[in-house]
């Protein structure tokens, strides 16, 4: 009797699961014919199974996206698996609507789940009220006054990298081929360690071995890279039950998180104790710990402020989640952007020369934040780099309800009707094409794909409508979820470019057509003929001598 009951229960559960799966399959198969996006203009699907996916994978550097946008207009669709329509728009009003209503357009659940496993529920991943609380408490740590205090760290680490490269140039007789990506990645790791939580990774120390926390974060970066290319991890993120199957990914991630938690909690405890002691002894006698510049100390100090109600404070776990968040958000993004900046300068000797002349007009090797920000051509070079080579090419939001998204530019649907809005069904993905907006000819003019810092003297009126938090660019996005650390990244990058371009002349070490990129979490450079070596940017470097 009991056996029969168990059998009936199992049969009922199996039937329910089968029915649920069948419903989802049927819904997916019908979506091309029921989706609110079905009448948007766009290219025909190459096949029922793949849609336009094979064409997209064959194209490089979003070339096909740009071709489609020029052909079909700023708001269109293309087809992914099973001919499912995917929205693509660079309409500034539409994107501003989505970014300014972030509560209705969170990150996709599968993306959040994958990132939480690696990073914890920090500012980049958190949604809703938790994100608002984290942001409110963290905002003061990223203000101009705080970034000013961190500039010395950026300059010191940039000079350390300069000296390492200078020694290599001298050893090799005046010129040397260097993978600048590697050195810049080590520099930004050291900088975010000190500026983020006063921890020295010693990544630039050529004789030192990676310390325990360094190794743990290297494992996290590797696992994040795996997310970009592993079909198993993609499927695992989409099917919740598969996440409970132990594998090498989960074991490595758990081991790295264990180290991060142990050392992170130790850092938090030490900083909380220092803040308490400083508060007891008074502001004037606070000592070096209270005046510490690192972001984690500032976050803990703000979180312990009597002005913050107890129920609005972050838990130690919430604070801990910011440690890997600081590292990921402030490490590879800046190093990759600076790598592409040096690449662009290697292709534009006149721009490189003009920039170097401006930099040599500063009478010090160790500029302040104000001195860096007072250099107009350096600022234009950084803006143009961030426009043409945004570290993150795009992001995605998911509609949590049916919505009507307004458009600045109306579109004509497949039936010849004009629309000044897009109707979005609940669950529809809304991509934010950062690189698409930054390189759009409709927004930036016919030379939008060219590196031309002079454009920043007067940008087109259309580009002025882009709803970015900085410089009419989508690089740091906009709205309530705009990148909180954009000032941090920009000053660090300026310190690097200032120090390195003053000291060296840069040429590309391989033919320009040999340089390509892979689009993942960040846009990493590769050499086509040396793909087995992984990400790299080989430049010929020689010391610059003032005449």
From Swiss-Prot:
It is found in: Membrane. Pathway: Secondary metabolite biosynthesis. It is a single-pass membrane protein. Keywords: Glycoprotein, Heme, Iron, Membrane, Metal-binding, Monooxygenase, Oxidoreductase, Transmembrane, Transmembrane helix. InterPro entries: Cyt_P450 (IPR001128), Cyt_P450_E_grp-IV (IPR002403), Cyt_P450_sf (IPR036396), Cytochrome_P450_monoxygenase (IPR050121). Its cofactor is heme. It holds the Pfam family p450. Its main location: membrane. Its EC number is 1.-.-.-. GO terms for cellular component: membrane. This is Cytochrome P450 monooxygenase 215. It comes from Postia placenta (strain ATCC 44394 / Madison 698-R).
